Amino acid sequence: MGRVKLKIKKLENTNGRQSTFAKRKNGILKKANELSILCDIDIVLLMFSPTGKAAICCGTRSSMEEVIAKFSQVTPQERTKRKFESLENLKKTFQKLDHDVNIREFIASSNSTVEDLSTQARILQARISEIHGRLSYWTEPDKINNVEHLGQLEISIRQSLDQLRAHKEHFGQQQQAMQIENANFVKDWSTCSMQDGIQIPLEQQLQSMSWILNSNTTNIVTEEHNSIPQREVECSASSSFGSYPGYFGTGKSPEMTIPGQETSFLDELNTGQLKQDTSSQQQFTNNNNITAYNPNLHNDMNHHQTLPPPPLPLTLPHAQVYIPMNQREYHMNGFFEAPPPDSSAYNDNTNQTRFGSSSSSLPCSISMFDEYLFSQVTKTKLSQRF
């Protein structure tokens, strides 16, 4: 049984090509080496496996460099002639083996491949030049001399405008959504703040502040501005408070037409105490560069102006601000009328001394003192004096 005849063509299986090359490589290298020894010739055999690995066979007579240098000295015409001679010998060999192989097709296919690659390169170069020319039309549209190019440029511009409009609408929707989200966030924060008790702004909370003494410490409480700026007011039964320029007192003791020496001494004691408080307040104002103002002058047209807000109260040591030990809270009213003729200035039911003006009703502020408290103070002062 003889060997299976192998058809000379490219093997489709990669593993088959690799195995065939591995089997026949050693035989070819052996034949080349034998030919070099028997004929005493210069020979170089260079092969690459299907995987790309090189296999070289050199004769014993010369090296690879000498053979390549000798081959380079051959003219191109001689190379072509030798090539065709080799192909004819190969064709005769195939015919003896009954292999129908067209050698011309191998040569033509190789030449056509190079020509095809050259043609494709020329086509690509032409397309690149055309694209560069179209790009130049955007910067210099006056150079366009083709209606087709003008139409393509118009289409490109319209597409760009459509993309810009779509991007603008999308960006506007995103911005509007962000504004709505921010508004909802602020609303939720305000709701949470109101639920937590933060309902009055800080500026409104600082507009009504006063100092009181509580357990030998200085505290801050919210109260109307009705006590400290009005302690120098001269209260007299004959005074009418005709104008506000004389609103601030001159430091003189008030003259009151109330019978009884005890009441006069009480007023003198009270006025002295209030003057000390006012002088302490004035000293504190001057030391801290704070502008004093009267919140009850808003009804005076001559003094109606925008007053600065009160300074932020601070907790200060007792050595800087004088506060009496028997500090009481004085509530001032805005309007009082003169007592009727049949009524007495002293009311036993309420245990309070009420001072009124004999003139018409005018806006003023008058202190109301507790009789029992100041009676004890008067007795103590009298005992110390005598």
Curated annotation (Swiss-Prot):
GO terms for cellular component: nucleus. One of its GO terms (molecular function) is DNA-binding transcription factor activity. It comes from the Eukaryota. Keywords: DNA-binding, Nucleus, Transcription, Transcription regulation. Residues 344-356 have a biased composition (Polar residues). The keyword Nucleotide-binding does not apply. It is found in: Nucleus. InterPro entries: MADS-box/MEF2_TF, SRF-like_MADS-box, TF_MADSbox, TF_MADSbox_sf. Residues 341-360 are annotated as: Disordered. Residues 1-53 form the MADS-box domain. The keyword Transcription applies. PANTHER family: SERUM RESPONSE FACTOR HOMOLOG. Forms heterodimers with AGL66 and AGL104. Probable transcription factor that forms heterodimers with the MADS-box proteins AGL66 and AGL104 and is involved in the regulation of pollen maturation at the late stages of pollen development and pollen tube growth. This is Agamous-like MADS-box protein AGL30. It comes from Arabidopsis thaliana (Mouse-ear cress). The lineage of its organism: Eukaryota, Viridiplantae, Streptophyta, Embryophyta, Tracheophyta. The gene is AGL30.
